[in-house]
Amino acid sequence: MKKHLLPLALLFSGISPAQALDVGDISSFMNSDSSTLSKTIKNSTDSGRLINIRLERLSSPLDDGQVISMDKPDELLLTPASLLLPAQASEVIRFFYKGPADEKERYYRIVWFDQALSDAQRDNANRSAVATASARIGTILVVAPRQANYHFQYANGSLTNTGNATLRILAYGPCLKAANGKECKENYYLMPGKSRRFTRVDTADNKGRVALWQGDKFIPVK
C-alpha cells in the first residue's frame, strides 16, 4: 500500500501548528464491540477558543477519498458540537455510532474549526482579523464493522488484509539495510483488501518479528 492510511488534513490560516488546538491522535478507531468513543482536546494557548465540530462520511481515508452520504441522519453523533474552551483548558468530546450493524467498515472525517474567542466576537467589519487566528483541522475516525471478520495472509515479508476491518501491523528486528542502523521498526495501518511489504526490517532474519492488532487483540505473525 503506497499511500499511508489516515493522513492528517491540517489547513492553517496564519497560525503555526504549535498554536493550534490539540485534538490528540490523527486517527481514532471505534472497535466492533464498542459504539462510543471519547477524544480529549486541549487549548494550549493563552486565550479562549471557539471550537465548532462537524462530521463527514468518507468513501476512503486515503487521499482520494470522497465525501459521501451517511446511511441515516443520526448514523454518527457527537457532543458537544460547539464549545468555548478557556486558555489551557481541556474538554472531552464523545462520539456515538448508531448506524447499521453490518460487515462494512466506515470512515469519517472530524473537522475541527478553531478560532480565537476575541476574534469570534468581533463584528463583520473586523472579519479579516478572524482569518489570522483560526484553523481548520481534519482527523479521521474509523468505525470497525459491527460484524468484523479478521483475516490476513503473510508471505515473504508482505502482509495482506483479507478481512473486512483495518489492521494495525508492525515489524521489528534487524534492519534490512546497514545504513538504517542495527534495529528497525515499522508500523502501518492496513485497510481491507490492501497489502503491505516491510521495507526497513529484515523479516527473513530469525530475529525479525511481525505482528498485528485485531482491534485490541495482539496477534504474533512471525
From Swiss-Prot:
- For the keyword Ligase, the answer is no
Q: What does this protein do?
A: Part of the ecpRABCDE operon, which encodes the E.coli common pilus (ECP). ECP is found in both commensal and pathogenic strains and plays a dual role in early-stage biofilm development and host cell recognition.
Q: What further note is attached to this protein's record?
A: Not expressed under classical laboratory conditions, but is functional when constitutively expressed.
Residues in the signal sequence: 1-20
Q: Which SUPFAM superfamilies match?
A: PapD-like (SSF49354)
A single Pfam family it belongs to is: EcpB_C
Q: Under what conditions is it induced? A: Negatively regulated by H-NS. Positively regulated by IHF and EcpR.
Q: What is this protein called?
A: Probable fimbrial chaperone EcpB
Record-linked Gene3D superfamilies? Immunoglobulins
Q: What is the lineage of its organism?
A: Bacteria, Pseudomonadati, Pseudomonadota, Gammaproteobacteria, Enterobacterales
UniProt family annotation: Belongs to the EcpB/EcpE family.
Alphabetized, the UniProt keywords read: Chaperone, Fimbrium biogenesis, Signal
